[in-house]
From Swiss-Prot:
Gene (UniProt): orn
Primary location class: cytoplasm
Domain of life per record: Bacteria
Keyword Nuclease annotated: yes
GO molecular function: 3'-5'-RNA exonuclease activity; nucleic acid binding
This protein's name: Oligoribonuclease
Amino acid sequence: MTDISAVAGQPALVRNELNLVWLDMEMTGLDPDTDRIIEIAVVVTNSTLDIAVEGPVLAIHQSDETLAKMDDWNKNTHGRSGLIDRVRASSVTEADAAAQIAAFLAEHVPPGKSPMCGNSICQDRRFMARWMPELERFFHYRNLDVSTLKELCRRWQPAIYKGFQKRAMHTALADIHESIDELKYYRERFLIPAAPAGETA
């Protein structure tokens, strides 16, 4: 677990109900009933995204039979990243991972307070509800999905939409940092506060 605060000397992240829990998982496919989780990572930020701390990054063991059922895209992507080898070498189960993540999160945010934050996060939530239900219940029922802003930008401000280039590394921790960076990008360019009443340019 590493402090990823950008500014030297910044205060540590204080436990607060307004802190945001960012999560990403890599899976063997898209169907939570037949596919499995193979990697999970979390990052907790303060509400303004200025201070952050990384949590556990865990490859989750799955059988060779489960890995063999992956389609070519998943085999190629997770093979190139080294994740398949990490999954085979791991002894961490889904229950182990859920317990480690929950213990880390409890140090930084009270249960039931943070929405689940990320990109297309409803998909992660579906898998978590299926395979890590106790961890899923740690979160508030709401989601903070950066994909919502992405889709609105694509329709309303296409130039801004095209300005953020994703690296598409498809590892859980890298994807989380990219989601946080993407939200900062939209905050600066798309979510522009209105001028106070009576203020003129």
